[in-house]
Amino acid sequence: MRLKQLTNLNTLLLLTVCLALGITLWWSQRAMERPFQLLDQYLELSQRFDEQVARNIRQYLGSGDAVRQQAALQALESLAEALPELPPDLARTLAPSLAELREFSAGDLLAAGKLAGDPQGLLLQAERDLTGNLEQWSAYLDAAAGQPQAGAYRTPLLLASLHLTRLSLARAKLVESANPALAGDVERELANLREQAGRIEALPLLGVLDEQRSASDDFAAMMGLAGDAEAGAGNAEDRGVALRRELASLLQRYPDELRRTRDLIERRQQLSADTGARLDAVRQALATLEPQVRGERQRLQGQVRLIQGGMIALILLIALAIDSLQRRLARVLGQLVPALSAWADGDFSRPISLRTRTEDLRNLEDSLNRLRSFLAELVGAIHRRAEQVAGSSQTLAEVSSGLHAGVERQAGDTGQIRDALGDMEAAIQQVAGDASQTADASRSAGQAVEHGQRVIGESLGGLRELVDEVQGNAQSIERLAEESATIGSVLTVIRSIAEQTNLLALNAAIEAARAGDQGRGFAVVAEEVRSLAQRTAGATEEIQQLIGRLQQAARQSVEAMRSQVEHAERTAEQAGAAEGALDEVVAAIHTIGVMAERIAEGSTQQSQAVGEIRSHSERIHALGGENLRLIGHSREQGEQLRQLGGDLRTTVQAFRL
């Protein structure tokens, strides 16, 4: 048997399991949907019956509306059409009760609806007629109010009205309750009413004639038969006769109307009971469907569980079959592990032997044995080539070592030349830089000296202006001192005036004291004047002291300014001498700058020449280093090749052929 066939068999088994599982799941889902569909159909039938059939029938019985009856019939027909959707057993259970209800709705229910009107309408009309007759009797009594016999009518008429009211109440109770036992109350009140009618009939007439002409009299008058009409008027009868006949007729008709009303009520009750029984029969039939629906659901669930159990058993069997095939294949392939492990260790001396009847595995055995023979021959050839590579790599390593030593010496010499040229170039660049810095410094010094000349010139002018200003300030301060002396003379005059005022105030106070009470006011004024004179004298003394200090400060300022003028004049003379010396310094610095620029230009040219020589030596040294690197790499590769040759020889020796 081939491996492909085993693989196809496993695949077929797995596909079979998947297909069977899918079919089972699909069938289970469909089977589980069926009970829910049946339950939905059952609930829908129940709801439709209650809302569309039972409700319309009840409304038809209450109102007699034919539209409700037609709606109920249409709903029953719709339910009958929906029965084939149910299982046959359920449909057979529900069909008879629906058919009976549909036949009843089309026949007896229609008659019951016709009786849906008010069954006591005839009795109400008869009672209204009796009420009207009694009212006419009252009008009859009013017309004969002057006669003594009229009073005998009032008591029976009043009692007749009372019994008529009781009759209406008893009739209403009978109709509303539909209780036959209440019919005796109606008959008793009717008998009382007849009794009063008999009493009224036994009373004598009151002689009130009927003055209204009939329609035949009017017609006779129109045709010219006036004589006949007058003859008829002469034969007019008492109004009480007609009222007696009408009352007797109404009382005789009322029992017949009562009997017909009772029959109508009984028929309505019977039809309502029949309708309720048929509706209950349909509801009972629908109720019996629920256990059947649930039983159908349990049956389908049992089938689903049975089929699912079978599928699980089938899956287990297929899994066991696949496991058995895989174990057999694993045992056969396990025989390859020792031989392949020996090959991995380099031992090709043992061939592979598989004991199997599978054609593909036998082909695999032959292929692996051919591979063992090929690898053995290949390892032998590699062993021979490894010996040759080891000898060649040894020779190449010796040549590379000699070449590497020569190139190293050459690289060392070129490196020394490069370093010497670098030092020389650095020295020349330093000289050129120093000369350039000297030229720059000389230029900067010249500019600084020129700036110093300008500053000294400006300072010299400023000093001269300062001397002039200081001299002007000294003169101003001297004038201030002179003015202060003038203020002192003025203060002397003020002081003398204050002393005289004080003496005058003292004399005035003495004279006021001599005058007594009359000179008291003048004494006060004199005291104030004396106080003012004393304050003036004090203020004058303070001003005199202040002016003295001011004059002292002015004299000191004049002396200081004179000293500053002398110092400024000496400084101006020194600045003039410094300006002349700076002119000589500027000329010398200019000469130094020119010479430094020439030195810098020569150094720059020498530095450029040395730089070119150094760049050439750098390239020579770089080429030597690159050659040294390549030769070193070649030597490393030769050494690696020698090592690889040795490793290859050692590795090939590990194989056993």
Swiss-Prot record:
GO CC annotations on file: plasma membrane
One example of a Gene Ontology biological process annotation: detection of phosphate ion
Entry keyword annotation includes Membrane: yes
Name of this chain's protein: Methyl-accepting chemotaxis protein CtpL
Cytoplasmic side: 1-5, 327-657
Organism in which the protein naturally occurs: Pseudomonas aeruginosa (strain ATCC 15692 / DSM 22644 / CIP 104116 / JCM 14847 / LMG 12228 / 1C / PRS 101 / PAO1)
Family matches, as Pfam families: MCPsignal
Keyword flag NADP: no
Membrane-spanning intervals of the chain: 6-26, 306-326
Domain Methyl-accepting transducer, chain residue ranges per copy: 385-621
PROSITE patterns according to UniProt: CHEMOTAXIS_TRANSDUC_2 (PS50111), HAMP (PS50885)
InterPro entries in the record: Chemotax_Me-accpt_rcpt, HAMP_dom, MCPsignal_dom
Function text: Chemotactic-signal transducers respond to changes in the concentration of attractants and repellents in the environment, transduce a signal from the outside to the inside of the cell, and facilitate sensory adaptation through the variation of the level of methylation. Chemoreceptor for inorganic phosphate, which is required for taxis at low concentrations of phosphate. Is also responsible for the positive chemotaxis toward 4-chloroaniline (4CA) and catechol. Does not recognize inorganic phosphate directly, but via a complex between the periplasmic protein PstS and inorganic phosphate.
Recorded topology in the membrane: Multi-pass membrane protein
Family matches, as SUPFAM superfamilies: Methyl-accepting chemotaxis protein (MCP) signaling domain
Ranges of the Periplasmic topological domain: 27-305
